[in-house]
UniProtKB/Swiss-Prot annotation:
It catalyses: nicotinate + 5-phospho-alpha-D-ribose 1-diphosphate + ATP + H2O = nicotinate beta-D-ribonucleotide + ADP + phosphate + diphosphate. The gene is pncB. Pathway: Cofactor biosynthesis; NAD(+) biosynthesis; nicotinate D-ribonucleotide from nicotinate: step 1/1. One of its GO terms (molecular function) is nicotinate phosphoribosyltransferase activity. GO terms for cellular component: cytosol. This is Nicotinate phosphoribosyltransferase. Its EC number is 6.3.4.21. It comes from Cronobacter sakazakii (strain ATCC BAA-894) (Enterobacter sakazakii). It comes from the Bacteria.
């Protein structure tokens, strides 16, 4: 085995909360749906040389299982039903669902299988890739360096917020998938826990062990899969929003808006959805324009924006979060999710810009168009054209 072949992942819960939240909904509503997903490196990194080391980690993941203590903890949360948790106790990663190869220097990964199982691969696999690559590239970087740099940023934060009322400022860790390492993420979260404005983490394992609130609702794949689950493409986003409420009628009500674009989302987000969902999450496009559109939409529907929450999570750092807080704080409730800029922010370390996105559902194409053209993902140009037509969208450039 290689130098770093000891398993990087120690628990099934070392993943983002929305994966379990979506998995339960899939378990209850779409048990037999099959999907395929693919890895993308949005940067110019040639990661193919790590394919064998990644395969070793993937093979080791089949031994992860929910512990009795973890099961009891999940049982005490309001989100989960007993039939799902009983099934989750039996869940094991199936490495045969993951194809990994070095394609001329580029890392090529494809996941396929039942959605209820494949849904679990994305976050831990990205975290493994990130940690492996950084171990090879930056073996001298340390937890202490990460913490020291965080203190510099916190000093800057205190300076830029001097005299600012932070009573409504809420920040959470969204940094699992592109973290420098598991140890760095834990150290960063433990330090941030001391701050009054830090409210939780997307990582279920850290939430359990550090007594924090697990944060997260649904991801793009929830909306993408409905493009093929729904009999009518034009109503697929409505179907996704309704199915989520069927599973979670009065909780986990933050809706992601940019699978098809914000404008298309708001056309589907009518009075009932806007009333029942607790808020919206921004993940692409201009955040100020997006927030203004959201507030105007609520106002047009006769809903007080201060009764709703806007979550910002697109490439945030402390400075961007405070800029948005200053702009919106007196008009709507706010939350800020910072990922890479928390958990992989060490001097001289270049974070990876890597994603895994759904590309097929039941053997047919799905797409993410988003409010940032460079984030658009789909192989099938004909399907993208059909999607644009169904949602009355302008031309959107496909990402390479």
């Amino acid at each position: 085995m290689t130098q770093y072949a000891s398993p990087l992942l120690q628990t099934l819960l070392d993943t983002d909360a929305y994966k379990l939240h979506m998995q339960q909904a899939v378990f209850h509503h779409y048990y037999d749906v099959h999907v395929a997903a693919e890895f993308r490196c949005r940067g110019d990194d040639l990661l193919g040389i790590y394919a064998d080391a990644i395969r070793e980690q993937v093979d080791a993941m089949q031994h992860l299982a929910l512990s009795d203590a973890e099961y009891q903890w999940l049982s005490g949360l309001p989100f989960f039903k007993s039939d799902y948790l009983q099934w989750l106790k039996t869940f094991r990663y199936d490495p045969t669902q993951v194809q990994i190869r070095n394609d001329g220097g580029k890392l090529d990964i494809r996941l396929s299988g039942p959605w209820r199982e494949v849904i679990m691969w994305e976050v831990p696999l990205l975290a493994v890739i990130s940690e492996l690559v950084h171990r090879y590239r930056s073996p001298e970087a340390s937890v202490d360096q990460a913490l020291a740099h965080l203190e510099v940023k916190l000093d800057d934060f205190r300076t830029m917020t001097d005299g600012l009322d932070l009573s409504a400022f809420r920040l959470m860790d969204f940094g699992t998938r592109r973290r420098f390492s598991r140890d760095v993420q834990q150290a960063i979260v433990e330090r941030l826990k001391l701050e009054p404005w830090f409210i939780g983490t997307s990582n279920y394992d850290l939430a359990r062990r550090l007594s924090l609130t697990p944060m997260g609702t649904q991801a793009h794949e929830w909306f993408q899969a409905h493009q093929q689950i729904s009999p009518d493409l034009a109503n697929s986003q409505i179907a996704a929003l309704q199915a989520w409420l069927d599973e979670y009628p009065d909780m986990l009500g933050i809706a992601l808006t940019d699978c098809i674009t914000m404008d298309a989302f708001l056309r589907d987000f009518g009075p009932e959805f806007a009333g029942r969902y607790q808020g919206l999450r921004h993940d692409s496009g201009d955040p100020v324009q997006w927030g203004e559109k959201a507030i105007a939409h609520y106002q047009q529907l006769g809903i007080d924006p201060l009764s709703k929450t806007l979550i910002f999570s697109d490439n945030l750092d402390f400075a961007k979060a405070i800029e948005l807080y200053r702009h919106f704080a007196d008009r709507v409730k706010l939350g800020f999710g910072i990922g890479t800029r928390l958990t992989c922010d060490i001097p001289h370390v270049k974070p990876l810009n890597i994603v895994i996105k759904l590309v097929e559902c039941n053997g047919r194409p799905v797409a993410k168009l988003s409010d940032s053209p460079g984030k658009t993902i789909c192989h099938d140009k004909a399907f993208v054209r059909a999607l644009r037509k169904a949602f009355d969208l302008p031309q959107v450039r496909k990402a390479s």
